[in-house]
């Protein structure tokens, strides 16, 4: 499956960090009304709670697991949103402008975090982002759109030197005599 995050952070603000991630695990729960009524799924619930604790440890949020989502700094809220998406165990993780609103230090930490996700969880990450330094730093392949039209695809080095990309995003130099 696929999980995504949004440009604007979408957390359950009145819930703890732990509960924000646990609720995403409910997508994978095999309970029904009968098993819920008689608490027959207690083992599955205990397993999911343990998985959430492990995920929070891996993403660096274990120490704030009992904090409300709203009490976290912006960078950690973004990390929590990504952890919640990972809790659904997607094959593809879509990150929509994850660096939006971040300061340069948070953006550097985000780049490292995305690399860790790819390595530790073996996930394909589709990144939609306007921070070119971030994109060039972490992407294996880049697809560039100009008003919805694909104008280039390739490695970061190929994209940096692509004339169509340069024209579209830096503008074509006007002839001084015109």
Model-predicted regions and their roles:
Residues 2-178:
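Glycine-rich phosphate-binding loops of nucleotide-dependent enzymes
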